């Protein structure tokens, strides 16, 4: 990305990270230089902590300009939904704009019609921009964007342009996706360098969620690379069971407990509220957890690191494009953000690793950013390696 996007991502992620399309870098024509966003009604001092902004507010006219349509799971999931909504709240609060969140009916069993109804309610409720989280929004968002052409849509975790049936790109939609394989790699590399060799991965979406698949494949690659360097063998349980709805469950906690009881030392909990089940199992079995999407160390003492992506920062940038009048330059496309944009990484403000240091981490992150370390994102190649034995749990 260019200067402004890199700047806003750096500013937001600096709170937890040390600063150091179909391609990884969007085409120049879809990613022009961007001026600073000029807020309509700026506050005297920028708010940087989303927890300082209420989840709900009441607008004077009953209209809400910036809307957020949640993914499955809870709004305050301390992960994907919350990280995305944080961006909505911060942009709105810092620019004097009204905002509201909409949760599709039927919770984890929400249908495409439920998601569309939430977007329709947002559009009819005055939304100028609708931020939708999660790849499962695709069908509903395509329908809503085609109907409400004056509304801008920001589709988080979308790795291609949104098109109509005839292949025409919807110009009022921007897709944002991340190179989760990079932060997954960093997490896998870190835990093996820390001395762990019995690992686990449990992912959401039943194996159909591209972001979770990239996280998991990166985790395997990083662990394998560290093991090869150290001359050790790593074993990893790898499962999509009990994660289709990204929810906590007794079944998931039981499975994770069984892994820990049988020698697993660290589990990467990759799927919203699934974290709660894995963290509970870890706490009961003296195990460790890798968090996902945001820094989850405050949620459990079992967390040793988290594979993070810049959800809040990217949403703020995209909203800024709507309000500075330049959204049309990127509408109908998607952007892919990674290390080069300071958009993925591990949290250093809460660093607890002792054998692999922040300096080590920054050096590896810099290699990813300059392209000298390339992490594969083709998760169809997931398999065991000479240094890592993969146990696919079905």
Please place each PLM-identified region on the residue numbering:
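C-terminal motif of bacterial Sec signal peptides marking the signal peptidase cleavage site
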Residues: 16-19
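A residue-level marker of the well-folded mature domains of exported/periplasmic proteins
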Residues: 22, 31-394
């Amino acid at each position: 990305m260019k200067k402004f996007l890199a700047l806003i991502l750096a500013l937001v992620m600096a709170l937890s990270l040390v600063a150091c399309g179909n391609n990884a870098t969007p085409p120049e024509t879809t990613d022009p230089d961007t001026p600073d966003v000029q807020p309509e009604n700026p506050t005297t001092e920028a708010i940087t902590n989303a927890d300082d902004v209420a989840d709900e507010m009441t607008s004077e006219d009953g209209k809400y300009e910036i809307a957020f349509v949640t993914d499955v799971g809870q709004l305050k999931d301390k992960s994907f939904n919350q990280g995305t909504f944080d961006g909505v709240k911060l942009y709105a609060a810092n620019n004097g704009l009204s905002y509201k969140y909409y949760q599709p009916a039927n919770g984890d069993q929400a249908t495409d019609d439920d998601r569309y109804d939430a977007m329709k309610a947002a559009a009819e409720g005055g939304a100028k921009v609708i931020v939708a989280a999660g790849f499962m929004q695709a069908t509903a968002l395509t329908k809503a964007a085609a109907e409400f052409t004056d509304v801008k849509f920001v589709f988080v975790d979308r790795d291609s342009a949104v098109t109509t049936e005839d292949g025409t790109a919807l110009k009022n939609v921007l897709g944002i996706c991340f190179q989760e394989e990079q932060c997954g790699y960093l997490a896998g590399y870190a835990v093996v360098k820390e001395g762990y060799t019995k690992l686990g991965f449990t992912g959401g979406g039943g194996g159909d969620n591209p972001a979770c698949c990239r996280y998991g494949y990166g985790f395997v690659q990083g662990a394998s690379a560290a093991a090869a360097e150290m001359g050790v063998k790593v074993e990893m349980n790898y499962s999509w069971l009990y994660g289709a709805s990204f929810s906590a469950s007794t079944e998931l906690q039981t499975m994770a407990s069984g892994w820990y009881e049988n020698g697993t030392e660290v589990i990467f909990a990759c799927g919203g509220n699934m974290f709660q089940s894995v963290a509970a199992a870890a706490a009961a079995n003296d195990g460790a957890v890798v968090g996902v999407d945001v820094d989850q160390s405050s949620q459990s003492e079992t967390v040793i690191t988290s594979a993070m992506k810049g959800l809040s920062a990217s949403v703020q940038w995209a909203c800024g494009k709507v309000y500075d009048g330049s959204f049309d330059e990127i509408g109908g496309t998607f952007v892919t953000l990674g290390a080069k944009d300071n958009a993925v990484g591990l949290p250093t403000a809460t660093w607890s690793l002792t054998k692999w240091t922040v300096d080590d981490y920054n050096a590896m992150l810099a290699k990813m950013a300059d392209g000298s370390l390339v992490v594969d994102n083709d998760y169809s190649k997931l398999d065991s390696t000479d240094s890592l034995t993969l146990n696919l749990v079905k």
